[in-house]
Every structure is written in C-alpha cells, then in structure tokens.
Amino acid sequence: MAGGNSFLARTGRAFKDFFSPIDLTKGTVWKVILKFTVPIIVSYILQQLYILSDAAICGQNLSADEVAGVNDTSPLVFIFMQFAFGCTAGFCVIMSNKIGAGDKNGMRRSFATQIVLCLAITVLLTAIAMSCISLMLAWVNVTPQNPQVYRAAYTYCFVIYAGIAAQLFFNFATSILRSIGDSFTPLLFLLISTVMNIWLDILFIKGFRWGVAGAAGATVLTQALCTVACFGYIFIKYKDLRPGKADFKIGTRDIAAHLKQGLPLGLQFSVLSIGLIVMLAETVKFDIMPGGAFVAGNPAQNGMGAANKLINFMMCPMSALGTAIVSYNAQNLGAGDTERVKRGTNQSLVIMLFLYVLFAGFGLLLTIGGAYQRIFLSADKISSESLRYGNAFLYVDLPLFIILGTLFVLRNGVQGIGKSIWTLAAGGGELIARVVICAFLPSLINGGAVNATASHAAFVALCFGDPGAWLFAVLILLYPYRKHILKKDYSYLFKK
C-alpha cells in the first residue's frame, strides 16, 4: 500500500511539474532548450491540425470552387493574424527580460501594457481588415469574374476578420505563458482547441450545412472560448502576474519599449504576407486560359494550396525552436549571461539540423502517390495537373528547408536580444527577393506572359520564390548574429 501511495505521489509531482515554468537561465543549455521546445513543437503541430481540420473537412465536403476560394484567403488572413502574432511575441521579450532580472513589478507593468496595446491593435486591425476585403481579394486575382470562388473567399475572410479579437488574445495569452517558461500549458489549451475545432467543423459544415461560413465560424468560436479559459488559468495560477490598478498607469516609456519590440516583428510578418500574396497572385495565373476563362477545377490553386498546407505542417518543429529561442535569449540577457545566449543560439542551430533531416524527409515521402493531396482534397479535386503543381512546389521547398531552419533560429535569436530592427530588415529582404523572383522569373523562363499554357519550368521558377526569400533574409541576419551574439557586443543596452 505504501508503495502504491509512493507511486501516486511521484506521478502527482511529475504531472504538477509539467505545469511549472522552466528556468531558462539555469541547467545544461541544450537540455533546457529541448525541454522547453518539445511542448511548443507539439503545440504548433496541433495548431496546424487545428488549421488542417478545416482544410480536410472543407476539401471533402465543399465544391472545388469553394475549396479554391478558402485556399486563396490564406495570405490575406496571414497578413493580419501574423501582424498580431508578431506584435504579441515581440511584446513578450520585455516580459522575459523582467523575469530574467527577477523584477516582479516590471512583469505586472509589462502585462498591463500588453493588454492595453492588444486592445488597441484589435480595434485597428478589425476596422482595416473588414473594410478592405474586396480590395485584397483583387490582389490575388480573386474577382467576381469567377463568382463561386470569389463568394467563398469573401465569406471566409469576413468571418475570420470579424473574430480577430479572439485569435489575437489567444496568441497573446500563450505568448505570456511561454515568456515565463511555461510551454506545457499552451500545449494543453491547443489540444483542447484542436478537438473542439474539429467537432465544431463537422457540426457546422456537415450538420448545419453552413459551408465556408461554418468553417471560419468554428475557428473563431473555438479560439474565443479557449482565450477565456487561458486567461482564467493565468490569473489563477500566476498571482504575481495579476496587474493592479497602479500597473495600468502606463507611461509613454512603457508603451515605447513594447512597441519597439513588437511593431518591427509584427511588420516583418505582415511584409512576408505581402510576398505570399504576390506568389499566390502569380499561381492563380496558371489557372487562367489566354482568353480569360478559368481552368476547370483550378488545379494550380488547389495543388499549390494542398502543398502549402503540408509545408506549414512540416516547418512546425523548426518554427517552434525559433519561438523557444526568443524566450531563452531574452531571459538570459535579462540575467546578464551573454555567454549562455551565445551557446544557446549555436546549439539551437545544431538541433535544427536534426529537425530538418527528419521533417523534410517525411514531407518528401508524402509526395509518393500524391498522399498529401488525399488528406486535403476529395478524390474529384485531385488530378494529374494538381499533383504536378503541388509536387513541383514541394520538390523545391522541402530540400531547402535547411535555409528556413537557419532563418527561424537567427531571426528569433536576434529578436530575443532586443535587436528587432534587424528582424524587420530581414522581412524586407524576404519581401524584395520573393516579389522579384515571383513577378519576373516565371515570365523570363517562359519567354512571355504566364497563363495556363505556360511551361512547367515557369511554374518551377515561381516555386523558387520561397527559398530565394529565405536565403536573402539569412544573409541579412548574419551581421547581428556575428556582431552581438557571437562577439557578445551588447553596448546598445547601455545607450540612453
């Protein structure tokens, strides 16, 4: 009996430890990073399942035009959601610095400042997004000329944009938890949200037959409910974070410090979205005949859309590693341990190599027999042409994932030491490279304007927009990585 009680006690302590924040300033560097990263990896994979459940259920239950419409909204949703995500991730660098320095008053003031800024950003983004839907759809060549695709895309954007608040504050809450070293609780909430979203998708799309609106509504409702639960957990579990009335007496210095970290990262992600919009607009051209009619089934859009979803899934582990290194570097810089910042960033690059081999290889395996398209599209939407377009994209992107992994580590490592202006510069570099490659290289290879009759080589040229953009950004980030992280030059911290 005593042995049984001992086992239960150990199990209880182990379960409790999962919910305890990790001190990123102590312990063996690579072990601490891995321990902190693994729940984030699982969280990001769940987040993709959360997104992919929409795609799979839509792909199996909606028409080809409706699926194409939903796929075409990806960069348009991305441009606002990623701005919000970038801002909240950047704001939390301040929180991590305060935690590393042991400044509890600073933690609460940072939390209060972030709440106010997130409310302001929500109002601004919702107003802009809701008023610009038709304009942005025109950017990606989705117009009333193809009414079924246009109607589906407009409806999806409208519902998602109306729920920006839920998505922004859910990202904010999970970023707060990770900034204090708790990467397990966001995983738990994402698990709950994934299951809930799949159930609501089935209910709204198959049960109520709400179509595209049902898919978007399920996502928004799920995130709203999980946001409330997540903030409730934060206020109950972490009493030191509860801001009081005095903490909301925010000065311009507090706002400026957070905006200095958040805005460049938010703008960087939005800038990336503009590049993706250009890439999508060029992809749509491969579905348009010389006379202006659309190819039946939209194979380029659906093939590329399915491939993009697989790419997003396979990049999750490397993206999660980048997310982890932000909090790791920020906490250790706050504690004044610059050598630990250097070792952590370098060891993260080694970890990234293992993740690259594993997940890029697995992604390539899923191209055999078009397996990935069978996940995201029903059989009637899969054709030799959709496979040709989708596989071409994957054969270019996946082998070059090592560049993307390097970008994730360097960009987030530099963000974690407070040099957010360099992350914005890298985003600008990505935009320039992607726009130049996507807008000019396909036409150059094709020997003229691109349309559904263009050569396969022209589409392959378009696919190089991704790795070309990643490489350009990495080249920019090598400077702050070498100057500040490797050479440990942190003199900028002491400048007034």
Predicted features by range, described:
Residues 1-37, 95-163, 209-263, 329-400, ...:
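Short alpha-helical transmembrane segments in multi-pass integral membrane proteins
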Residues 85-88, 159-178, 186-194, 215-230, ...:
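Short runs within selected transmembrane alpha-helices of multi-pass transporters and secretion channels
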Residues 67-127, 167-186, 301-364, 404-426:
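Small-residue-rich hydrophobic transmembrane alpha-helices
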Residues 49-68, 137-147, 203-210, 270-307, ...:
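Helix-terminus/linker motif at the lipid-water interface of multi-pass membrane proteins
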Residues 41, 45, 49, 53, ...:
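Generic alpha-helical transmembrane segments of integral inner-membrane proteins
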Residues 26, 30-49, 53, 76-83, ...:
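Residue-level signal for short hydrophobic patches within transmembrane helices
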Residues 64-75, 153, 157, 216, ...:
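Small-residue hotspots at the loop-to-helix junctions and early N-terminal turns
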Residues 35-54, 159, 193, 222-226, ...:
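Transmembrane helical elements of multi-pass membrane transporters/channels
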